[in-house]
């Protein structure tokens, strides 16, 4: 039985090893998190979760400097629902609240920027793929890959 996602909701695309961060003043006080970015037919969901990948799997998801539209193997809707329940900092963005999806260049790196409207307030989130990460004192990205997000942007806009 699903608690956080609806019974008729299904995964359209998923991308592991994504770093998410809120843009603006509130983002300054929060650390960016590594997780899985999931597009369902009703929501965009970011679940903070470490997923180990071998180099061959990295090519499947973001090879050729492009964020590819694919689904993670062995990651179902029930797994997603369980991860959302376990991680209180999961981010659920209903597709009807999304105002804009775009590719933004910052520090010579492309990020996926999603703007949402909640209760009349606009919140902005950036998502990127880390090239190198530091593990001490906490796991944080040092550099990001310059990834083309156009395939994801087109897919998200087709569901809006």
Task: Locate predicted features.
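The phosphoinositide-binding surface of pleckstrin homology
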Residues: 2-31
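Acidic, Ser/Thr- and proline-rich intrinsically disordered linker/docking segments
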Residues: 32-34, 45-160
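Structural motif
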Residues: 40-41
């Amino acid at each position: 039985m699903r608690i956080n996602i609806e019974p008729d909701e299904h995964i359209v695309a998923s991308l592991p090893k994504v770093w998410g961060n809120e843009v603006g003043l509130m983002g300054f006080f929060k650390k960016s998190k590594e997780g899985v970015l999931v597009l369902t037919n009703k929501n965009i969901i970011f679940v903070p979760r470490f997923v180990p990948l071998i180099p061959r799997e990295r090519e499947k998801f973001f090879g050729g400097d492009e964020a590819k539209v694919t689904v993670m193997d062995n990651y179902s809707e029930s797994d997603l629902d369980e991860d959302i329940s376990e991680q209180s900092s999961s981010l659920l963005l209903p597709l009807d609240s999304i105002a804009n999806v775009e590719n933004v260049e910052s520090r010579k790196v492309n990020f996926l920027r999603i703007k949402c409207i909640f209760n009349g307030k606009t919140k902005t989130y950036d998502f990127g793929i880390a090239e190198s990460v530091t593990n001490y004192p906490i796991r944080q990205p040092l550099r990001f890959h310059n990834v083309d997000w156009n395939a994801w942007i087109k897919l998200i806009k087709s569901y809006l």
